Amino acid sequence: MTPFSGNNPCDAWLSKFYGKMPFEDYLLLDRAARTLEGNVARGNKPWSPLRGIRPSCVIFPGIWNWDSAFHVLGVSRWNPELARDQIRILFRLQQPSGLIPDVIFEDGRIMNRYGKPPVLPWAAAILEQRSPDPEFRELCVAAFRRNETFWRNNRTGKKIGLFHYDADGETPEERFRDAKYESGWDNSVRWDNGISNLFAIDLNCYMVLFYRAMRILDPNPLWESREQELIRRIEETLWNETDQCYEDRNMENGEFNGVITPASFMPLFIGSASPERAAAMAEIAEKHEMPGWPSVSYQNPNFDPEGYWRGRTWLNIAYFALKGLKNYGFDSLADQGRNTLLNWVRAVPGFLCENYHPVSGKPIGAVHFGWSAAFVIEFLLNWNSELPMAETRQK
């Protein structure tokens, strides 16, 4: 196999790696990049003439919020203008409140009762670092200022200053359902006893990345101040001293939910954990998440290896957890997890899957899945270096 020649930016980018990495890795890199390229929606769409990347070319008829952020992470490496289109599509949907909706469907419907985890600013800042564009940067700053105001005004416990997921459902049942969708972890064990009353560990870490992104896009002491204050609150409030683990916490009664998932490791990814807490999390990883990094601990009584967010392995959340461990020096543990997941991906020739069985590694869910492709690329190319904006590890 040799790379194509011509004017295709994906081909040109892939050619840089041909013969310079293990061939099995090159084949996987090629498959991942072409998955993202192949998911570009064809024909006239509600977002035309912008080119939107669907989560999968097989199902998911629309453009999803946090999927798009992860697509930006991938395609910005070889086609920054295509990456910018993903962000522009979502900016067109932004509500007067500042909320960036969950999805726009191909029939024009917009799901705007809730958002998605705020990873778009992080992806936009990485795009800006890879391919600066002053005009696009101004567009991002205006939209993200409004979006940050939305999260601060509508998704915080005012007295404590931490963030929670929520939604605008007309009934308590709708609000509960839609808040789970806003989290992206639709049916997670984390939410079995409620979600709108929980300070979610991943959300608060994503907001730290939001503030770091704003420091790049919109240099202003305000963003660093908010970042550092949020880090302080995460470390003071979301560390369970009894369990020696980061966990979601009920903002009304102060109780931890006791659920261990890859989200528990997000403070390692953002670098806020002390070395002592990171070491405790490494022990948690060995007991609860190795080798397959399921979406809830193998030891959890509600673990279901085929449950959507109740056991299946998702490459995005597994990457954040494993990269956090890697950045803290737990190389053997992190490398073992990475290699397990990449071997599962390699074992299925021809396509990348939405998620994987955490015991057998068999593929589950949609095929040709975009964010799986994006994180395969990160596992291959951004494993031994610091990911942008994850650089403030506590000493």
Put a short name on every predicted segment.
Residues L120-A123, F210, A263, P267, ...:
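The tetratricopeptide repeat
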Residues G19, G74, D218-P221:
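Generic amphipathic alpha-helical segments used as scaffolds and interaction surfaces in large
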Residues P9, E24-A32, N79-R92, D133-R152, ...:
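Extended, well-ordered alpha-helical scaffold segments
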Residues M1-N8:
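Extended acidic/polar, glycine-enriched regions
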Residues P61-S68, V72-I87, R92-A179, N204, ...:
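Aromatic-rich carbohydrate-recognition surfaces in CAZymes
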Residues L14-G62, D85-I110, K159-L198, I231-T313, ...:
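Extended glycan-interaction surfaces of carbohydrate-active proteins
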